[in-house]
Amino acid sequence: MASTTVAQLAAELSRSAAALLEQLQAAGVGKATPEDIITESDKTRLLDYLKRSHGQADDSSRKKITLTKRETSEIRQSDGTGKTRTVQVEVRKKRVLIKRDEAAPDAQADAVEAQAPVVDAVEEARRDEEERQQAELLARQEAEAKAAREAAEREEAERRARQEALEAEQRRQAELAARKAEEEAAASRAVTEANEDSSRKKAEDEKARVTAERAEAQKAADEAKAAADKARAEQEVAARKRREAAEAEARAIQQMLNAPPRVLKAPSERKAEEKKAEQTGTLHKPVKPAGATTEAKKDEKKPATTTTTTATADKKGKVVKAGWQDDSSRKKGSGLKTRGDTSGGVGGWRGGPRGRGGRQQQHDDSRSSFQAPTEPVVREVHVPETVSVADLAHKMAVKASEVIKQMMKLGQMVTINQVLDQETAMIVVEEMGHKAYAAKLDDPEALLVVGGEEHTDAELLPRPPVVTVMGHVDHGKTSLLDYIRRTKVAAGEAGGITQHIGAYHVETDRGVITFLDTPGHEAFTAMRARGAKATDIVILVVAADDGVMPQTKEAIAHAKAAGVPIVVAINKIDKPDANPDRVKQELVAEQVVPEEYGGDSPFVPVSAKMGTGVEDLLEQVLLQAEVLELTAPVDAPAKGLVVEAQLDKGKGPIATILVSSGTLKRGDVVLAGSAYGRVRAMLDENGKPTKEAGPSIPVEIQGLSEVPAAGEEVLVLPDERKAREIALFRQGKFRDVKLAKQQAAKLENMLEQMAEGEVQTLPLIVKADVQGSQEALVQSLQKLSTAEVRVQIVHGGVGGISESDVNLATASKAVIIGFNVRADAGARKLAEHNGIDIRYYNIIYDAVDEIKAAMSGMLAPEKRETTIGQVEVRQVFRVPKIGAVAGCMVTDGLVKRNSLVRVLRNNVVIHDGELDSLKRFKDDVKEVKQGFECGLSIKNFNDVQEGDQLEVYEITEVARTL
């Protein structure tokens, strides 16, 4: 076994040998020099010592657990001021649990049972020698350690003895000092007590003397005070009696002087007169009682000393009252009693016993209790959407004339019954110093919310998807639907383009699908927006040979705004010039990414003509519908959307409705915007009668009171009276808002027309077969307006052209446009008699083009200047009575009589005028061509010189186009 010295171990531990020797000696290992040998047992003892010195327990140490428990309580305690304080008291308890190691006996038993390894004799001898050496070393070390311990014990005993002796001496000294201090304190206390006894005796004697003197003085003062109080009381009683007598005498004299001569009446007659005055008086001008004049004169003679009125002196020196005090404060209290009386209760509801009492007391009370308003009253005015001038004045408690004056200050002339919009009314209220709030009307539509909550617990069942087909015009939307429906709808549309929004439901092998076919022409933007609003999935049809067009981009925007998934159908792939890859790239630029590029929009190549890819398209649509998990309640009142509406001459108003939830049945009461009614008949898209329609099914209903606006929400109500009430409320609201907006825009239009000058207007009356077409046509025509010619839509409606339309056109000098409608016999005869122009169209852009041409004819023609010749002045002749005549040579073009000319001298225009005469030799001629000489004179210009150039031109008018 390799031997290790103290120096080597110190080098391994990076410590000095001296420090290691000190630690070995402290651990009980007797090593004196760095060359001593250290065995493994020495190292173990050193390690155990180091562990104990650093607080680390060995393996045989006990394991303990300390448990700490805290309890908190409160104690209420009063302090010196009497306030109660709460003191928090915390009690801590600690418990230590010790567990002995159970593995030690087992480890010892295992160590005993372990067999010794087999070693040879040489190894045994070497080990015996090492053990002997270690035993000797251990004995030597133990002896040295024992000696060191004995020396340390002796030294510790000596140190402890010295410490005890020192402590005993200190205790003795402290006892002596304490005894001495006690003796000194006892002596001082004795002296102090003696001094205190003598001073206390002197103080008691002095206090007794002072108390006796003070008692004598207090007794004398009490006697003097009692005598003075008695004399003062006698004087006050005598003075009060004299003052009361004088006041009574003065009052009697004053009453005698102020009392006018009058006929005395019995109390019953006075009460009758007071009752009559109360009956004949009014709120603002109560009738004065009999004694009011006397009281008024009496008040005038009295000095004005009240704080609620101001007094001024007139020319005669008489005091005249000027203030807020009215006649009711001077009268006897027998006027008309009002709830808002401010006379201190004299003439009000809570007056004295029947208003009786002293007149002077009543007058003083009324004058002292009345308070004049110090600032104007600020009212909170709730302004509805529309309000008349009279109602607005009533809300502010002012006269209507004040509101009219304020409106005139704001630059508007109004009448008392004129309707103001909410914004204008709120401005007027704030200008007049009140607070304006937008009022919430008693809206009957709130009943719709309450009614809709009753059916929120209906069972939700799967419903068919609503698919809208959108795209550019002539890209094959309707043809694609034709192939799906196996019909020929496109051939029936005028011009081969769709001008109505069509709703169909198709039963396929995979389920029912409802299709909405929207127009692709640019004029039908609102129709496409309604289609996207009501849809679940959008099929975007793009022609493979045409690519992405403006209406394609618009359809993408509508679909994204509605948040519905898009399925792209690349149509017309059977054409030779079809390029589907170009279409994909263009759609990627519009943020429509195909699935193969990592997007979420499936692209399906189809051919509506050949039927290629149609089945794949339907499969993609149904796959998207499954992902959406479309559900709707069936056993509930129906809700839906007006897809299209029209007026039939025989059937009346007809509306195409797409049911979104619930079941619509024949006989239900429906509300659509401002139209209501009971469903008299219900037809499907094929014109066949049906009794009910579930979710996602389009139907055509009859029985409404008027033609509803396309896009309105349809609701089924249980009560027809409630439906009529809501419809009438919406009609009145729409009318009031429309009138208010028109009135607000009148002044602005007048100012615009004054600034722009005269503007040509083309008044039109538009009648169409369905609501959507009329709306699209009106919007397209209004877009044609320019700064010089403006389209004015006098009236737009649905249905045939009637006599009332012709009369309106006669009054407004308008042109009637009929889109897919005709005029009846009476209307035609009336139009011929009045010279009214009626135009019929069935294609929307034909109507737009003709109106555009008519507006172009109304434009002022454009004036263009054309140079027709150049003339050089060769010689100038002065002719009496005529002036200067220029002899000229036509160098370019020709010269005509009465042509316009410019005189250029050194390439500078010095005159612009007209020819007066044109002659060749002595003959008047109409024109002179290039290369010929002529003589000419210019109107109002005689300063012609040789070498001048004449530029001959003419102005032509050119018709302008939009």
From Swiss-Prot:
Where, in this chain's numbering, is GTP bound? 471-478, 517-521, 571-574
Q: Which InterPro entries match?
A: DNA-bd_dom_put_sf, EF-G-like_DII, EFTu-like_2, IF2_assoc_dom_bac, IF2_II, IF2_N, P-loop_NTPase, Small_GTP-bd
Bias type Basic and acidic residues, positions = 52-77, 123-183, 197-250, 267-278
Q: Which parts of this chain are annotated as the region Disordered?
A: 52-87, 121-378
From the UniProt entry, list the residue stretches annotated as the region G3: 517-520
Ranges for region G2:
496-500
* Record region (G1): 471-478
Task: Answer yes or no on keyword Endoplasmic reticulum.
Answer: no
Q: Give the span(s) annotated as G5.
A: 607-609
Q: Where is the composition biased (Polar residues)?
A: 78-87
Query: Where is the protein found, in the record's own terms?
Result: Cytoplasm
Keywords of this protein's UniProt record, alphabetized? Cytoplasm, GTP-binding, Initiation factor, Nucleotide-binding, Protein biosynthesis
Biased composition range(s): Gly residues: 342-355
Q: Which domain of life is it from?
A: Bacteria
Q: Which GO terms describe its cellular component?
A: cytosol
Q: Which Pfam families match?
A: EF-G_D2, GTP_EFTU, GTP_EFTU_D2, IF-2, IF2_assoc, IF2_N
- Describe the location of the tr-type G domain by residue ranges: 462-631
GO terms of molecular function: GTP binding; GTPase activity; guanosine tetraphosphate binding; translation initiation factor activity
Q: Respond yes or no to whether keyword Cytoplasm is given for this record.
A: yes
- Region of interest called G4, as start-end residue ranges on this chain: 571-574
- Protein function: One of the essential components for the initiation of protein synthesis. Protects formylmethionyl-tRNA from spontaneous hydrolysis and promotes its binding to the 30S ribosomal subunits. Also involved in the hydrolysis of GTP during the formation of the 70S ribosomal complex.
Return the similarity comment. Answer: Belongs to the TRAFAC class translation factor GTPase superfamily. Classic translation factor GTPase family. IF-2 subfamily.
PANTHER family per UniProt: TR-TYPE G DOMAIN-CONTAINING PROTEIN, TRANSLATION INITIATION FACTOR IF-2-RELATED
What name does UniProt use for this protein?
Translation initiation factor IF-2
Q: Which organism is it from?
A: Cupriavidus necator (strain ATCC 17699 / DSM 428 / KCTC 22496 / NCIMB 10442 / H16 / Stanier 337)
